From Swiss-Prot:
Keywords: Actin-binding, Cytoplasm, Cytoskeleton, Disease variant, Kelch repeat, Phosphoprotein, Repeat, Ubl conjugation pathway
UniProt Kelch repeat ranges: 302-347, 348-394, 396-441, 442-490, 491-537, 539-585
Record note on what altering residue 164 to F does: In PHA2D; impaired interaction with CUL3; de novo mutation
Gene name of this polypeptide: KLHL3
Disease note: Pseudohypoaldosteronism 2D: A disorder characterized by severe hypertension, hyperkalemia, hyperchloremia, hyperchloremic metabolic acidosis, and correction of physiologic abnormalities by thiazide diuretics. PHA2D inheritance is autosomal dominant or recessive.
Phenotypic consequence of residue 528 to H: In PHA2D; dominant negative effect due to homodimer formation; impaired interaction with WNK1 and WNK4 and impaired ubiquitination of WNK4
InterPro entries, per the entry: BACK, BTB-kelch_protein, BTB/POZ_dom, Kelch-typ_b-propeller, Kelch_1, KLHL3_BACK, SKP1/BTB/POZ_sf
Name of the protein in question: Kelch-like protein 3
């Protein structure tokens, strides 16, 4: 207001006007309330001026009615109404354990409470009973922050029971967005039929392929096969079989015993087969729930850059937020690691093998982005550095590399379902510093260094998991060891690398349909031993070295414009031989 000075403080303030006689002093002391409650709590601890005892189980708590009534509508109604408790000196609270009630009454006096994994499930309903809505909301916020593929369905059920509407929606959205990881957990396998149907029928389900939904149904049925077998048809009604590749329908769905033994399921399969026989324009005319593509909510992504040389092996891990154009440090590796294979699989980032500064290793560390934590899993059969790593059909492949004495042609695969490594067919050529990528169900090993001939390689091999065989495909136009290899729009990119002392900035692209390579625009900088990933239709090349120094810069390729652009912000550390993966941003 004009002519008035307003400031929230414990100072004396003056309202000035035309008439000096209208002066007045307003004192606002924000610490007053806190001091008053502190004194009241001290009185309570000494059992002074207390006029009520609150009892739960065998815990007795002395308190002041006016304080409880001022902070809790539950107590206010109790003490001001016509109930017998309004005058009782001792009041028993049922459905709340003594320790929890004590914490909540402490909160009433102090405005402080600690919410933990251990107490949140008893604290929230107790806070709801006492109508301490701030505590209830804090519990909901805590549970939301703890959402993880292994617990989101349990949190969803808890939120439903206690009518926590926002938390229920958040947990349900999380389950939909992380379905490939959620379906692997005990919580999913323990869902009721209606709960499974509700989840897999959602248009918002985030799956790279409808294969995941089919696998989830089979897993759920087999978990308690005798009692669940009768539900097979009802579940398959929600699997969008027409959207599956024809090869998968023939080789996997048709061969599944649970499908063969159910006539309704066979009808769904026939429907899908007929759909594939139709021309594309006629397919678009078919409108039913099983031919409708899912429309998941797009989750923001971040890029994880793991370890590397700077100039020695490091533990540092950096995270790039694409939306905010910002780099952050996240949890370090348990030990130094460079020249490792790094992939994203089943909701986690895997760092496979590599070099720790003194030894080539066969160890594997796994990063959980929700917990910001690394853990160790089963080690590979062989030590490998400068290997290639890729994911195909839910298996992590470790390809070639160097064991400290020789280049490797061997290849091994890891199943996260069994936590075991096993060998598959070896390549035809030993390859260290090899780049790998997966296109249309085939694994490609690109270039590298052949220790036997002591030459960098231009040859490329393709692995077919169905036949467990490697064959040569078209050579690149030039020899490349330490090339950054990535996949974009069904094509395989080989970026940079080196041939002896010559470090390249050229890039070429392989089309599996024509078995040919073609040149595209050069990068802005010569790079070898860089990390590569694809995000939102762009190919990112991260760090590496130019033959004389490690690079902190990142550039990306747009295939529409055939141009490379440098990111405006660099990593905090120049690093080569780092691994790169893309994960969903933890919200």
């Amino acid at each position: 207001m004009e002519g008035e000075s307003v400031k929230l403080s414990s100072q004396t303030l003056i309202q000035a006007g035309d008439d000096e006689k209208n002066q007045r002093t307003i004192t606002v002391n924000p610490a007053h309330m806190g001091k008053a409650f502190k004194v009241m709590n001290e009185l309570r601890s000494k059992q002074l001026l207390c006029d009520v005892m609150i009892v739960a189980e065998d815990v007795e708590i002395e308190a002041h009615r006016v304080v409880l009534a001022a902070c809790s509508p539950y107590f206010c109604a109790m003490f001001t109404g016509d109930m017998s408790e309004s005058k009782a000196k001792k009041i028993e609270i049922k459905d709340v354990d003594g320790q929890t009630l004590s914490k909540l009454i402490d909160y009433i006096y102090t405005a402080e409470i600690e919410v933990t994994e251990e107490n949140v499930q008893v604290l929230l309903p107790a806070a709801s009973l006492l109508q301490l809505m701030d505590v209830r909301q804090n519990c909901c916020d805590f549970l939301q922050s703890q959402l993880h593929p292994t617990n989101c369905l349990g949190i969803r059920a808890f939120a439903d029971v206690h009518t926590c509407t926002d938390l229920l929606q958040q947990a349900n959205a999380y389950a939909e967005q992380h379905f490939p990881e959620v379906m692997l957990g005990e919580e999913f396998l323990s869902l009721s039929l209606d709960q499974v149907c509700s989840l897999i029928s959602s248009d918002k389900l985030t799956v790279s392929s409808e294969e995941k939904v089919f696998e989830a149904v089979i897993s759920w049925i087999n978990y308690e096969k005798e009692t669940r077998l009768e539900h097979m048809a009802k579940l398959m009604e929600h699997v969008r079989l027409p959207l599956l590749p024809r090869d998968y329908l023939v080789q996997t769905v048709e061969e599944e015993a649970l499908i063969k033994n159910n006539n309704t399921c066979k009808d769904f399969l026939i429907e899908a087969m007929k759909y594939h026989l139709l021309p594309l324009d006629q397919r678009l005319l078919i409108k039913n729930p099983r031919t409708k593509p899912r429309t998941p909510v797009s989750l923001p992504k971040v890029m994880i850059v793991v370890g590397g040389q700077a100039p020695k092996a490091i533990r540092s891990v950096e995270c790039y937020d694409f939306e905010e154009d910002r780099w952050d440090q996240i949890a370090e590796l348990p030990s130094r690691r460079c020249r490792a294979g790094v992939v994203f699989m089943a909701g986690h980032v895997y760092a496979v093998g590599g070099f720790n500064g003194s030894l080539r290793v066969r160890t594997v560390d796994v990063y959980d982005g929700v917990k910001d934590q690394w853990t160790s899993i089963a080690s590979m059969q062989e030590r490998r550095s400068t290997l290639g790593a890729a994911v195909l059909n839910d298996l992590l492949y470790a390809v070639g590399g160097f064991d400290g004495s020789t280049g490797l042609a061997s290849v091994e695969a890891y199943s996260y379902k069994t936590n075991e490594w096993f060998f598959v067919a070896p390549m035809n050529t030993r390859r260290s510093s090899v780049g790998v990528g997966v296109v249309e169900g085939k694994l490609y090993a690109v270039g590298g260094y052949d220790g036997a001939s002591r030459q960098c390689l231009s040859t490329v091999e393709q692995y077919n998991p169905a036949t467990n065989e490697w064959i040569y495909v078209a050579d690149m136009s030039t020899r490349r060891s330490g090339a950054g290899v990535g996949v974009l729009s069904g094509q395989l990119y080989a970026t940079g690398g080196h041939d002896g002392p010559l470090v390249r900035k050229s890039v070429e692209v392989y089309d599996p349909g024509t078995n040919t390579w073609k040149q595209v625009a050069d990068m802005n900088m010569c790079r070898r031993n860089a990390g590569v990933c694809a995000v939102n239709g762009l190919l990112y090349v991260v760090g590496g070295d130019d033959g004389s120094c490690n690079l902190a810069s990142v550039e990306y390729y747009n295939p529409v414009t055939d141009k490379w652009t440098l990111l405006p912000t660099n990593m905090s550390t120049g690093r080569s031989y780092a691994g790169v993966a893309v994960i969903h941003k933890s919200l």
